[in-house]
From Swiss-Prot:
This is DNA ligase C1. GO terms for molecular function: ATP binding; DNA ligase (ATP) activity. It comes from Mycolicibacterium smegmatis (strain ATCC 700084 / mc(2)155). Its cofactor is a divalent metal cation. Disruption phenotype: Not essential; a double ligC1-ligC2 mutant grows normally, no effect on NHEJ. In a triple deletion with ligD NHEJ on blunt-ended plasmid is 90-fold impaired. In quadruple ligB-ligC1-ligC2-ligD deletions NHEJ on blunt and 5'-overhangs is 0.22 and 0.12% of wild-type respectively, only 4-fold decrease in 3'-overhang NHEJ. It comes from the Bacteria. DNA ligase that seals nicks in double-stranded DNA during DNA replication, DNA recombination and DNA repair. Has weak intrinsic nick joining activities and accumulates DNA-adenylate. Acts as a backup for LigD in the Ku-LigD-dependent NHEJ pathway. The keyword Nucleotide-binding does not apply. Belongs to the ATP-dependent DNA ligase family. PROSITE patterns: DNA_LIGASE_A1 (PS00697). Its EC number is 6.5.1.1. Keywords: Ligase.
Length: 348
């Protein structure tokens, strides 16, 4: 490929916040799509669809490679999301389950799913157009290039944007019904910084991508009782930050079958005693740190990185086959608004 920006390249990332930034004239707002992050490199008939972690997504979405050749300009590098929309109860919504099923080793199954639930590409940034790199250009310039690069036909689209903070906040509520994931804010004058958390994301819940580093068997003896979760510190150590529990009986058995192949021999480790139940068995089975899950949580506790953990048990949302374990770090976590206690109380 003869492009000014070559694969692989890390996408620019987002830092979670609890509130949509509202400085007028500073930010551009757009929906947060619930799919697989993807970078598209096109040079004539050569098309590469790269995942967030630098891997080739093209083999899983062959129908999309054809669409990208047909609906993008001949020479470009775009950032966007691969999604699968489906008609669900009379409305078109994003379907995460259909999307995640595409990450499968069997080419025959991929071919069948490509016909049954074809994928779309949603473009939301441009890294290059023609022979010109746009990495150092402000987003307002890259946005114009994106509109020029995509011929909105059937499978490739450009996401909506607005510079109105009130509309960005409204989208956080209104677009949830279509299966979207929240709102992204980008600095209008900001360059594209690969691998840096320069964008802001505001989601409908606080979530985190965690490494499944171990599990405990359910007290009944059948299936998974809890999945133990880890995040990588800056020194490269995987730190346990809590666990996800409260699975149905059916899911407990299914999760055990999914996690058993990752066991590190027959080793069992002793866990910290429970502050709620001194009789609870806290032994756990360690796993190779290869599988990533998305969880929803309420708060973190602890003042140092070494002591930070989820305050309560978290909710398991889904596996993230598009995530690398090494990307599960503390810097993805939401930073709560900084309030002094007395600022919350009524003035006397």
């Amino acid at each position: 490929m003869d492009l000014p920006v070559q694969p692989p390249i890390e996408p620019m990332l987002a830092k979670a916040q609890v509130k949509v930034p509202d400085e007028a004239g500073v930010w551009s707002y757009e929906p947060k799509w619930d799919g697989f992050r993807a970078l598209v490199f096109r040079d004539g008939d050569d098309v590469v669809l790269q995942s967030r972690n630098g891997k080739d997504l093209g083999r899983y979405f062959p129908e999309l490679l054809d669409a990208l050749r047909d609906e993008l300009v001949e020479k470009c590098v775009l950032d966007g999301e691969v999604v699968v929309p489906r008609d669900i109860a009379g409305r078109v919504r994003l379907d995460w389950e259909s999307l995640s099923q595409r990450i499968h080793p069997a080419a025959s199954r991929i071919k069948m799913l490509a016909e049954q639930t074809p994928a779309h590409f949603i473009g939301f940034d441009a890294l290059a157009l023609g022979d010109r790199s746009l990495l150092k250009e402000p987003f307002r310039v890259r946005r114009e290039a994106l509109a020029e690069a995509v011929d909105n036909k059937r499978w490739c689209h450009v996401t909506r944007t607005s510079e109105d903070p009130a509309l960005g906040t409204e989208w956080l509520k209104t677009f949830e019904g279509a299966g979207l994931d929240g709102v992204i804010a980008k600095r209008l004058d900001g360059p594209y910084l690969p691998g840096k958390r320069e964008m802001v994301k505001v989601k409908h819940h606080r979530d985190a991508d965690c490494v499944a580093m171990g599990y405990r068997i359910h007290k009944s003896g059948d299936g998974i009782g809890s999945i133990l979760l880890g995040l990588y510190r800056d020194d490269g150590e995987l730190q346990m930050v809590g666990g996800a529990a409260s699975f149905t009986a059916k899911d407990r058995i299914k999760l055990l079958a999914e996690l058993e192949p990752l066991r590190e021999g027959d080793e069992m480790r002793e866990g910290d005693p429970s502050r709620w139940n001194s009789a609870a068995d806290k032994r756990w089975t360690p796993l190779r740190p290869e599988k990533v899950c998305e969880v929803a949580y309420d708060q973190m506790e602890g003042n140092s990185v070494e002591g930070r953990r989820f305050r309560h048990a978290v909710k398991f949302l889904r596996w993230r086959p598009d995530r690398e374990p090494s990307s599960c770090t503390f810097d993805q976590l939401d930073t709560p608004l900084n309030y002094d206690l007395y600022d919350v109380l009524e003035e006397q």
